[in-house]
């Protein structure tokens, strides 16, 4: 009985988040009210507040959902069986394309994510840490196989994600879209070259 209740509550939370995301995309997060979400779900605003204690909590849940989709896809790539350099190229490219699609392709969602980053939400910090950890997993595989040469995998992963800011960070992706700079492929080539073992000098 307890398990059924817990499942029902989890389902309701998920419905609230999915509905909030839909409204954020349609009318924007600033114009969306808890009453709007409740009306679409055919429940009272008080019932929504049973699951989320504030509108900010709903914002964070939507952000977590969007970021979680990127993390899930990135993790799947990290655990593929291809060579580490092939996986890292695919991983960095995929993160860029997913972020561009989710956060810059939709202006209303972009505004919410921009606010989350500017206000330093914990969900954003946790997401960046998880993405860095996923990148570190691939670099570690490469270091063990001799494909990459790095004495500090954690530092290498942080360096890579920092180098990819132009292609990872939602605001920077939008701001730099029409500005001169390296292409995604050129940046990934640079990262892979930086991680590759140095040939001995002749």
Protein language model features and the residues they cover:
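Short secondary-structure transition hinges
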Residues: 90, 96-136, 144
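N-terminal intrinsically disordered/low-complexity leader segments
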Residues: 1-11, 199-202
